[in-house]
């Protein structure tokens, strides 16, 4: 990167991604692993995970619309939060008053177990040293113990904000500058649960969601998103995974999902589908699995695999 401000620098990075989608008639399963070093990716384990999920999703049943307790696996939580974050934690969106943060900074709006940062320096992710304007990366607290703390900035949005506002090193590629600064390295602090099974045990009656599909932003100021579950949705009964479910349509206010969180796994996963509408990108979200008291199902789709 070379800029008119006098910066000139380069960085080299690598990333390795293994994705597996196992499908038969009426059943499917998905798994992924991402790391900056290929030695840390195990394609065999990814394939086995996807096959096991697919095996368990055969003969899926339906679920009535309603508000359910849920456990979201890391793939599901990662996608949900990345969509939410791009409109919520953007300094430009905040300036234009189209962010959920507008008028709420400093307020506790999420469960106190929830802490979120943008951290492109974390070696567990896909580290970057500077952004597309040459500004050094830094860890940016976004939510601390449920309290809304801030947003990310690039040079134009920081200048527009005025005062002492500085870029946080979140300028996007030139072709995407219209979106303003973006939090490319979402990181959610893990909790106390030692496994996903431990989270499932917290839910007497609810659903487990492996992965999401075709998300869309409905109302950014309220953080409302809609989409479908896919590749492994199950009913939870008496703290155990029970029968598989067809793909479900959901419409959720992400703040509601994060407002009452019984638990999060201690371990975090680098969630990254590696492509967005066929465009390759090397970004991901470091996220745990999460148990939530509210996940709103609004309809059903086809069986897994469709």
Language model feature labels by segment:
Residues 1-306:
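N-terminal small-residue-enriched
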């Amino acid at each position: 990167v070379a800029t008119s401000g006098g910066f000139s620098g380069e960085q080299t990075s690598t990333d390795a991604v293994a994705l597996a989608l196992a499908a038969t008639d009426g059943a499917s399963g998905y798994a992924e692993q991402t790391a900056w070093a290929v030695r840390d990716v195990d394609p065999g384990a990814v394939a086995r995970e996807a096959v096991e999920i697919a095996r368990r999703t055969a003969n899926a049943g339906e679920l009535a619309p309603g508000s359910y307790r849920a456990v979201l696996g890391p793939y599901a939580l990662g996608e949900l939060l990345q969509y939410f974050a791009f409109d919520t934690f953007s300094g430009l969106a905040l300036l234009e008053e189209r962010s959920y943060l507008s008028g709420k900074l400093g307020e506790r709006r999420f469960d106190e177990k929830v802490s979120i940062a943008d951290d492109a320096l974390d070696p567990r992710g896909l580290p970057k040293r500077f952004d597309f304007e040459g500004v050094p990366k830094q860890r940016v607290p976004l939510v601390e113990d449920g309290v809304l703390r801030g947003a990310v900035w690039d040079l134009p949005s920081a200048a527009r904000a005025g005062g002492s506002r500085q870029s946080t090193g979140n300028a996007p590629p030139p072709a995407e500058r219209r979106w303003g600064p973006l939090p490319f390295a979402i990181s959610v602090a893990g909790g106390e649960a030692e496994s996903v099974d431990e989270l499932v045990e917290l839910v007497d009656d609810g659903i487990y969601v492996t992965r999401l599909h075709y998300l869309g932003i409905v109302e950014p100021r309220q953080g409302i998103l809609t989409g479908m579950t896919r590749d492994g949705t199950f009913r939870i009964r008496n703290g155990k995974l029970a029968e598989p479910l067809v793909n479900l349509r959901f419409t959720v206010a992400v703040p509601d999902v994060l407002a009452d969180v019984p638990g999060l796994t201690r371990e975090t996963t680098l969630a990254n589908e590696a492509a967005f509408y066929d465009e390759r990108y090397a970004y991901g979200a470091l996220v745990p699995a999460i148990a939530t008291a509210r996940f709103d199902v609004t309809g059903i789709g086809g069986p897994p695999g469709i």
